[in-house]
Structure formats: structure tokens, C-alpha cells
A protein has these predicted regions:
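Long, hydrophobic/aromatic-enriched structural stretches that serve as scaffold segments
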Residues: 1-10
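Internal, well-folded beta-alpha domain core
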Residues: 9-160, 167-169
Length: 169
């Protein structure tokens, strides 16, 4: 998809791939939480798919505790989670039980005289940010603000502490 086009995982160095393996997690409707090098079978199952089984009315309720616990375990060495997932997928995380600060970057493009979130570009920008954080081995929220790929620039004026905004003309 668009996020993975921005990530360009195939162009990362071996060191960058190792960093991604330690720090990047991918949310999946079928597998829950994945690392970049996990081997999976091809599938098409969106997190928002209406499917009920056992005591679960949907995939969100099925995965919520497991994904949250998995992330908490992986976040023991970090106090920050940079959320680059869509709203749909991140809804599978119980943020109230997450043991870290969540930073939700926002990407806006200039169109018709104003900045707005354009879904197609925002998806690709999330992948670009993941690539940037991996290539720069980001360790702090300040590292995030240096993101400048594909014409995006951090806007302190538009941002809040947990929702940095990146604008592109």
C-alpha cells in the first residue's frame, strides 16, 4: 500500500533493517503485531472488517488486549510510541493501558488555499516518516521534528506536544 511505498524497506541497509526489526511494529487484522522480517502468507483482511467470533464482535475486540500487551512488552526500553498507523488500525490498541506516551504525527498538504489532510498523501507520509526514523535511528521526540522528506516541514505553530504537524506546500 501507500504507507509501504513511502517506507521503501527494500532500500534500507542491513543496519537499518536491524534497527527496524527492534523498533518498528506493524498492526495486522490477521496476525496482530508483526515485525518487519516476520514471514507471513499473503492475505487481505482489514482491521475494520465486520466479523464476529467467540465472544468478540469484531477484530478490534479480538486483538485489543493482545496487541496492547505486546506493545507494552516491546516498549519496556522506550517511553515513546510514535503512532504511524491509520486511525482504523490504531483503534485496536487500548491506549489507556499503554505504558508509554503516544505521539501521533499529522501530515497536511496545501490545497485550495489551505492546509488539509489528504488521505493518499498522508498514508505515504507515514511510511516516509517511518523510513526517516529508521535511517536516523531516532530515539527522542525531538528527532521526530527533524523530519523533512518529500517537502514536509515541521510546524511548531500548528503542533501540540503529542501531535506534531508537518506541512507541505
Amino acid at each position: 500500500g501507500d504507507v509501504y511505498q513511502g517506507l521503501e524497506f527494500e532500500k534500507l541497509s542491513k543496519k537499518e533493517i536491524n534497527f527496524a526489526q527492534k523498533h518498528l511494529r506493524i498492526l495486522s487484522g490477521l496476525y496482530g503485531v508483526l515485525k518487519p522480517l516476520d514471514i507471513i502468507s499473503p492475505y487481505r483482511l482489514e482491521m475494520g472488517t465486520k466479523i464476529s467470533f467467540a465472544k468478540n464482535k469484531d477484530l478490534y475486540s479480538f486483538w485489543k488486549d493482545e496487541i496492547t500487551n505486546h506493545l507494552n512488552k516491546d516498549l519496556k526500553s522506550s517511553s515513546i510510541l510514535v503512532n504511524l498507523a491509520s486511525v482504523e488500525y490504531f483503534s485496536s490498541v487500548n491506549t489507556e493501558k499503554l505504558n508509554s506516551r503516544v505521539i501521533n504525527p499529522v501530515f497536511k498538504d496545501f490545497k485550495n488555499g489551505q492546509y488539509k489532510i489528504i488521505s493518499f498523501y498522508a498514508k505515504k507520509a507515514r511510511g516516509l516518516m517511518a523510513k526517516f526514523l529508521i535511517e536516523n535511528r531516532a530515539r527522542s521526540s525531538e528527532d521526530l521534528y527533524k523530519f523533512n522528506l518529500d517537502g514536509y516541514k515541521f510546524s511548531k505553530k500548528e503542533s501540540t506536544e503529542d501531535s506534531p504537524v508537518f506541512l507541505r506546500k
